[in-house]
Amino acid sequence: YMNYANKNFPNGVKSELGDIIAYHNDTTVDWLGFYGQGNYTSGALNAYGMLGTSSIKYSYQDHFTVANEKITSPSISAMQVKGGVMYDVNENISVFGNLGLVEKPPIMDNVIYFDGTVASDPANEKFQSMEFGMNYNTAKYAVKASYYNTQWMDRNLTKSVTTGQGSSGDTDVIFLTGVDQSHTGFELEGSAQVIDMLRLDFAASFGTWQFVDDASGNYQ
């Protein structure tokens, strides 16, 4: 295989079987997490809850660089709390509600970029979610209706731009912060057992998913 992409070698670089070409990177992901959950039932009431925490750390090493330096990110901690309750009004109708707060550590690409650039202050993505609804069930019919509201905050995004400025000379990495989204909507689903061998299912969803607030970016 002859590679003519490197301008420092106008006659090309010859690679044979077993040679390493294009890139030679090592990456690691160290993850540690704990969680606990519980459930409570009393008569028509059923409730559950869970609590969890985790910590993650990344490393990146590009063996094609002169320094061959191993780059390690700081440990990033996150937590999650979820809970819900369901109450049987009667044998056919039940109502329910769920709440949750979840932190999601950024993926490696949003902490250490492919060129070795490290984000200065990577933030956890955060999800605040609630859902309320009801179920209706009979021998032949089943209907579920629910309303949800999810706020997705500090979504992590990276953008590569060519500017002719910055330490790289022509290409810079922008770590975007404050990218927030709002997801709200109403969902309906159900089924009808017309005869023993025929069941009809239906589903509908109406939602508003949109970006909110202004985002900002940091050159690295």
Give the location of each predicted region.
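Outer-membrane beta-barrel pore domains and translocons
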Residues: Y1, T41, M50-I56, M86, ...
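Signature of Gram-negative outer-membrane beta-barrel scaffolds
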Residues: Y1-N90, I112, S216
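Outer-membrane beta-barrel proteins
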Residues: I20-D26, Q37, E69-S73, V85, ...
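Residues on the lipid-exposed face of transmembrane beta-strands in outer-membrane beta-barrel proteins
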Residues: F34-Y40, G83-Y87, F132-Y136, L188-A192, ...
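Gram-negative outer-membrane beta-barrel transporters
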Residues: T41-A44, N149-Q151, F175-Q220
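Repeated loop/turn-to-beta-strand initiation elements of outer-membrane beta-barrel proteins
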Residues: A44-A47, N92-V95, K140-V143, D196-L200
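Surface-exposed extracellular loop regions of Gram-negative outer-membrane beta-barrel proteins
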Residues: S55-D62, S73, M86-E131, A142, ...
